[in-house]
């Protein structure tokens, strides 16, 4: 199976072999004849998201590391940067530029051979899922949405902390204690563990050789790379362990059997797996441990394994996979060492997700439980929006309150507010502003979740430092919210950057459902009876010409929203009247690409602006395309 995530940018290339070793790459080049310029691409076993280029020349194989830069480009050390591994290979087919020769002929994977996955790729999906479950106590759709929207960040988080789940990692123990642990039980050559030496990211590899325990210091350099003295550098400990399980490469011997951590009773919890025969050197032959990564089960969220008691460590005779995580829960990791994720906020899940917070049967709230601040957050034809606090059963919830003008006494305005409340009470998604309820008191009030940073367009106008990948992250979240609306048979009808509110710089929610309509199961569009005060510059041609609204017309609006986001909150069709915009669209013309906007994102905008509604993509397709591009640029 092809690996996802880190190798996604190369999986489509027929000459990409995935997580193979240098020796395996050389064997393939020999199969291909070793002609000068014959080459293949493989996944780096040292650097997260990196690759290695193996090239034949002079009957020898030459290997070049391709690192992924912080801005998402790829480069061979000291060479030019390229948008993708494919672009890099194409460039070096025309310019040697530091390579031993030009790349002349790719060696493609034999028929039926898929890119090989590494140990982390095999474990990653389950590790991420369990990490999200246990860290934020999420289930169902909230869990799925968290994984989809934050997968690149979660992958990096898991990749750099995965060693904590591995049986060979013993945390911060002393040199003397590590020797005692290694010498307990079998004396298999290559038996090993890794311990933390200090709080600065320094570790030690403890390795058994001919009855003696050897200690190799593992240092972290200024860029965060890990290595033994004079050894290869790695992004993670598990990559280092994987490498030295294949070849000694400076060690006295390869790593074979990990010293696993034992519970207080001296038993290893295998989560129901059958026990395997006792450890034997042949079982742990070089490279063999990688090929035996198996599925595993985690404890239920909240289950905590008792910590090992000092002096009560003994070695089980059960064979243990060094790449299989320990059956212990993830430690909560919400400290200052990482940026807050949407799941860290109080508005990711519904306020009624807590079973003790009983959702009222009626949407009406008790005014006595609502406190309002004097300062206005915004205003419009309907009235004002203020910040407030609503006393729920267990917590006080910070809320935004839309207050109808007191003097209006316009039944139409009240009907609009109630219609909006009716739509909102049916929606529950992390990327949509949820309604808490409505209040009938000195004025009619709609009580909603709070998004502190306000409208997306205004935020971007005032924060030009926000990077492309951050904008891609936000518009992807909007597409997830709109995909949910599409699946729920709702048409928004007022999708624009002004109606996307930011909870944090990395968390967006769709708001303002005043024009929204619920479609019946047998309907795929809503037909307005009359032309109202419509945001024409965001509307698809069929809305303007035929008053027909559907999820596909929301897709058109989403394209305009994307243009607003990548132009940092500029107004679309600036200086043009609605009739001029309509005429422009009828001629097949569209807005130009915002300065600095990635070409792929402008291409997606134009796809959203497909004139014929039947040929325009739905949000399922738009979200998937955005997701793939987002994963590619953020990884």
Curated annotation (Swiss-Prot):
Keyword Cell membrane among UniProt keywords: yes
Binding site for ATP: 377-385, 402
GO biological process, one term: collagen-activated tyrosine kinase receptor signaling pathway
Principal EC category: transferase
Resulting phenotype, residue 297 to A: Abolishes YWHAG binding
Oligomer and partners: Interacts with LYN; phosphorylates SYK. Interacts with RHOH (phosphorylated); regulates mast cells activation. Interacts with NFAM1 (phosphorylated); probably involved in BCR signaling. Interacts with VAV1 (via SH2 domain); phosphorylates VAV1 upon BCR activation. Interacts with GAB2 (phosphorylated); probably involved in IgE Fc receptor signaling. Interacts (via its SH2 domains) with CD79A (via its phosphorylated ITAM domain); the interaction stimulates SYK autophosphorylation and activation. Interacts with FCRL3. (Microbial infection) Interacts with Epstein-Barr virus LMP2A.
Cited function: Non-receptor tyrosine kinase which mediates signal transduction downstream of a variety of transmembrane receptors including classical immunoreceptors like the B-cell receptor (BCR). Regulates several biological processes including innate and adaptive immunity, cell adhesion, osteoclast maturation, platelet activation and vascular development. Assembles into signaling complexes with activated receptors at the plasma membrane via interaction between its SH2 domains and the receptor tyrosine-phosphorylated ITAM domains.
Catalyzed reaction equations: L-tyrosyl-[protein] + ATP = O-phospho-L-tyrosyl-[protein] + ADP + H(+)
Posttranslational mods: Ubiquitinated by CBLB after BCR activation; which promotes proteasomal degradation. Autophosphorylated. Phosphorylated on tyrosine residues by LYN following receptors engagement. Phosphorylation on Tyr-323 creates a binding site for CBL, an adapter protein that serves as a negative regulator of BCR-stimulated calcium ion signaling. Phosphorylation at Tyr-348 creates a binding site for VAV1. Phosphorylation on Tyr-348 and Tyr-352 enhances the phosphorylation and activation of phospholipase C-gamma and the early phase of calcium ion mobilization via a phosphoinositide 3-kinase-independent pathway. Phosphorylated on tyrosine residues in response to IL15.
Domain Protein kinase, chain residue ranges per copy: 371-631
Tissue expression profile of the protein: Widely expressed in hematopoietic cells (at protein level). Expressed in neutrophils (at protein level). Within the B-cell compartment, expressed from pro- and pre-B cells to plasma cells.
Entry superkingdom: Eukaryota
Entry-annotated residues carrying Phosphothreonine: 256, 317, 345, 384, 530, 582
Modified residues (Phosphoserine): 44, 202, 295, 297, 316, 319, 350, 379, 579
Single GO term (MF): integrin binding
Annotated domain remarks: The SH2 domains mediate the interaction of SYK with the phosphorylated ITAM domains of transmembrane proteins. Some proteins like CLEC1B have a partial ITAM domain (also called hemITAM) containing a single YxxL motif. The interaction with SYK requires CLEC1B homodimerization.
Protein name: Tyrosine-protein kinase SYK
Annotated family: Belongs to the protein kinase superfamily. Tyr protein kinase family. SYK/ZAP-70 subfamily.
Disorder association: Immunodeficiency 82 with systemic inflammation: An autosomal dominant immunologic disorder with onset in early childhood. It is characterized by recurrent infections with various organisms, and multi-organ inflammation that manifests as colitis, hepatitis, arthritis and dermatitis. Patients have a propensity for the development of lymphoma, usually in adulthood. Disease severity is variable.
Region listing for Interdomain B, in residue ranges: 260-370
Principal location: membrane
Regulation: Autoinhibited. Intramolecular binding of the interdomains A and B (also called linker region) to parts of the catalytic domain keep the catalytic center in an inactive conformation. The phosphorylation of the interdomains or the binding of the SH2 domains with dually phosphorylated ITAM domains on transmembrane proteins disrupt those intramolecular interactions allowing the kinase domain to adopt an active conformation.
EC annotation from Swiss-Prot or TrEMBL: 2.7.10.2
Positions of region (Interdomain A): 108-167
Location(s) in or outside the cell: Cell membrane; Cytoplasm, Cytosol
């Amino acid at each position: 199976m092809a690996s996802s995530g880190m190798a996604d940018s190369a999986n489509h290339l027929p000459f990409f072999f995935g997580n193979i070793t240098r020796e395996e790459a050389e064997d393939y080049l020999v199969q291909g004849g070793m002609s000068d310029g014959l080459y293949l691409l493989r996944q780096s076993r040292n650097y997260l998201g990196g690759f290695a280029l193996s090239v034949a020349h002079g009957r020898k194989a030459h290997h070049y590391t391709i690192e992924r830069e912080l801005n998402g480009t790829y480069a061979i050390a000291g060479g030019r940067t390229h948008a993708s591994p494919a672009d890099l290979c194409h460039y070096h087919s025309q310019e040697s530029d530091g390579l031993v020769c030009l790349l002349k002929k790719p060696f493609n994977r034999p028929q039926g051979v898929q890119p090989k996955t590494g140990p982390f790729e095999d474990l990653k999906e389950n590790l991420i899922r369990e990490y999200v479950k246990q860290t934020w106590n999420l289930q169902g759709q909230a869990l799925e949405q968290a994984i989809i929207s934050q997968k690149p960040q979660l992958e990096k988080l898991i990749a750099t902390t995965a060693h904590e789940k591995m049986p060979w990692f013993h945390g911060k123990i002393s040199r003397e204690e590590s020797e005692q642990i290694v010498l307990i039980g079998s004396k298999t050559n290559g038996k090993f563990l890794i311990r933390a030496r200090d709080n600065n990211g320094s570790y030690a590899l403890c390795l058994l050789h001919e009855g003696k325990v050897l200690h190799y210091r593992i240092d972290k350099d200024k860029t965060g790379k890990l290595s033994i003295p004079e050894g290869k550098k790695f992004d993670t400990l598990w990559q280092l362990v994987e490498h030295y399980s294949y070849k000694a490469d400076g060690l006295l011997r390869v790593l074979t059997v990990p010293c696993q951590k034992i519970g207080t009773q001296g038993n290893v919890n295998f989560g129901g797996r059958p026990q395997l025969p006792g450890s034997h050197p042949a079982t742990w032959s070089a490279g063999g441990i990688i090929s035996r990564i198996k599925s595993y089960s985690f404890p239920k969220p909240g289950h905590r394994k008792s910590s090992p008691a000092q002096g009560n460590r003994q070695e089980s005779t059960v064979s243990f996979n060094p790449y299989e995580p320990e059956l212990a829960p993830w430690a909560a990791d919400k400290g200052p060492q990482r940026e807050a994720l949407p799941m860290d906020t109080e508005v990711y899940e519904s306020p009624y997700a807590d079973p003790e917070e009983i959702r009222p049967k009626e949407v009406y709230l008790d005014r006595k439980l609502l406190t309002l601040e004097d300062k206005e957050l915004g205003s419009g034809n309907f009235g004002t929006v203020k910040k407030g606090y609503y006393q729920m059963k267990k917590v006080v919830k910070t809320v935004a309150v839309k207050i109808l003008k007191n003097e209006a006494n316009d039944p139409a305005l009240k009907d609009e507010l109630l219609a909006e409340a009716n739509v909102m009470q049916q929606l529950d998604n992390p990327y949509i502003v949820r309604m808490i309820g409505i209040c009938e008191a000195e004025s009619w009030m709609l009580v909603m979740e709070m998004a502190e940073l306000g409208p997306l367009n205004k935020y971007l106008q005032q924060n030009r430092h926000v990077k492309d990948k951050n904008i891609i992250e936000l518009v992807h979240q909007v597409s997830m919210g709109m995909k949910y609306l599409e699946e729920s048979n709702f048409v928004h009808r007022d999708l624009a950057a002004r109606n996307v509110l930011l909870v944090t710089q990395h968390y967006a929610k769709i708001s303002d459902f005043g024009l929204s309509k619920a479609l019946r199961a047998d309907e795929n569009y809503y037909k307005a009876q009359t032309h109202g005060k419509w945001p024409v510059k965001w509307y698809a041609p069929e809305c303007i010409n035929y008053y027909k609204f559907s999820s596909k017309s929301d897709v058109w609006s989403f394209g305009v929203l994307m243009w607003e986001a990548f132009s940092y909150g500029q107004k679309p069709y600036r200086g043009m009247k609605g009739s001029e915009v309509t005429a422009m669209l009828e001629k097949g013309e569209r807005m130009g690409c915002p300065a600095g906007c990635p070409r792929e994102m402008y291409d997606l905008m134009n796809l959203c602006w497909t004139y014929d509604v039947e040929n325009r993509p739905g949000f399922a397709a738009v979200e998937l395309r955005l997701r793939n591009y987002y994963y590619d640029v953020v990884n």
